[in-house]
Amino acid sequence: MLWMLARAVAFRRPGRGLAGGRGLWTGRPQSDCDSMKPLEGVRILDLTRVLAGPFATMNLGDLGAEVIKVERPGAGDDTRSWGPPFVNTESTYFLSVNRNKKSIAVNIKDPRGVRIVKELAAICDVFVENYVPGKLSEMGLGYEDIDKIAPHIIYCSITGYGQTGPMSHRAGYDAIASAMSGLMHITGPEDGDPVRPGVAMTDLATGLFAYGAIMAGLLQRYRTGKGLFIDCNLLSSQVACLTQVAANYLIGQKEAKRWGTAHGSIVPYQAFKTKDGYLVIGAGNNQQFAVVCKILNLPELIDDCKYRTNHLRVQNRKELVKILSARFAEEVTAKWLCLFEGSGIPYGPINSLKDVFSEAQVLHNGLVMEMNHPTVGKISVPGPAVRYSKFKMSEAKPPPLLGQHTRHILKEVLRYDEGAIEKLLCSGVIEQHETK
């Protein structure tokens, strides 16, 4: 029964089609589709918590997908309690990565809760989870279980280390994967200790890999009519992101080291202390180096035999950086910004967050997104990084309260009657947050 329902929803939902046209779904005239977001009509069942998974599903929601976030009654996503800071009782951490989602609070340790999740999976296009491998299978919600009732499903599993292997049973957190992948080894002062990056880059990179993989899965299903399983993990994501640093070791047998703000293969490319702050510049070729020298009024460095090529500048890094540092320290940051403006040299100050969100280009790019939260009122979060010509990314629904949409989803999506919903509420299998 669930399998038949899944097939009907997957391939007969309005706006869907399996062939023809330019878009993924072809059930509407092309003129109507031009202003639609590309994932309108796609439904995501989101069992993820914390950052990597919620970041992936938020990006999918930004593109028009309906995201149903499944949370534990009483507690919800772990990040709901992460703080301070809080706004009233809402964690700003949670608010940052959960816009454009609906929350249903369901106890998936109860068989009745498992049934609800399965019923939702049958009418969803994508199932995303970030449990330790095997945990959801124990509850009857593993890929094999969902595939039986929803063979169209794109099932994305986000873990710490992968589905198999000697570490697959371990829980995964950003800092641990950052350490084990080598990222922490190459981050920090040149002569200092390893440093955790200031934002959870491993989680975020994994979320972006999962986001891209889910999009690829939907395209694959468009071609084949079949779902698939996606194995995405923190360790693999971060090792893949080592790129040229990894290649230096794998091809050149060169062990990586920490460079602070500097670059191991390009000089000068780092932060320099000014009279009142820091300025980062990058000279990636000889022409750019010559321009930097002219701006700094150090033209004698251009033809110095020790600095004529990048290779020589890397060899003589310490001496050159000492000369440049002394010059940068003579003026305030604002003066250097004026001198570098229009030069063609990549440059910029090291900004505090106050500086970031008053930066003209940040505001111009629409990177501050405002929403009206049901209990907090107006909130601002970082907006989407990408813009599109055919549809707007500025309109967003605020992050949900825990269980805010439980009753709505059961009644309007799964067609439960009021009696069945009340029974589940009374038994604690589900939870509804009533907004005023």
UniProtKB/Swiss-Prot annotation:
Active-site residues per Swiss-Prot or TrEMBL entry: D203 (nucleophile)
Main location group: mitochondrion
Cystines in this chain: none
Catalytic activity: glutarate + succinyl-CoA = glutaryl-CoA + succinate; 3-hydroxy-3-methylglutarate + succinyl-CoA = (3S)-3-hydroxy-3-methylglutaryl-CoA + succinate; 3-hydroxy-3-methylglutarate + glutaryl-CoA = (3S)-3-hydroxy-3-methylglutaryl-CoA + glutarate; hexanedioate + glutaryl-CoA = hexanedioyl-CoA + glutarate
Keyword Acetylation (UniProt): yes
InterPro entries referenced in this protein's UniProt entry, alphabetically: CoA-transferase_III_domain, CoA-Trfase_fam_III, CoA-Trfase_III_dom3_sf, CoA-Trfase_III_dom_1_sf
EC number(s) given by UniProt: 2.8.3.-, 2.8.3.13
Transit peptide per record: 1-8
Coiled coil: none
Annotated function: Coenzyme A (CoA) transferase that reversibly catalyzes the transfer of a CoA moiety from a dicarboxyl-CoA to a dicarboxylate in a metabolite recycling process. Displays preference for succinyl-CoA and glutarate-CoA as dicarboxyl-CoA donors and glutarate, succinate, adipate/hexanedioate, itaconate and 3-hydroxy-3-methylglutarate as dicarboxylate acceptors. Acts on intermediates or end products of lysine and tryptophan degradation pathway, in particular catalyzes succinyl-CoA-dependent reesterification of free glutarate into glutaryl-CoA to prevent renal excretion of glutarate.
Similarity-based family: Belongs to the CoA-transferase III family.
Protein name in the entry: Succinyl-CoA:glutarate CoA-transferase
Source taxonomy: Eukaryota, Metazoa, Chordata, Craniata, Vertebrata
